[in-house]
Amino acid sequence: MATGATIEVLYFAQVAEHMGLRHETQPLDAPIQAGDWLDALAVRCPALGPAARLKLAINQEHVGRTATIRPGDEVAVFEPVTGG
């Protein structure tokens, strides 16, 4: 996990391709709702498409849009996976 007023962000599969990177450290001075953070990410990279379809995990636990991201967290962003 990151320390201080940052979060460690991991991007997987198509999300990483659209972002052009697999990992970055982002500043985060105060807690933020995951949905708000995802919305900001979609604005930053419109190629991701609607933020509502993206999935995330905080500190290796799958969470929904109402979860809270806090400084020091590790956030993983990925697309839904289906099988069949």
Region spans (language model):
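Ubiquitin-like/PB1-type beta-grasp interaction modules and other compact soluble beta-rich domains
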Residues: M1-G83
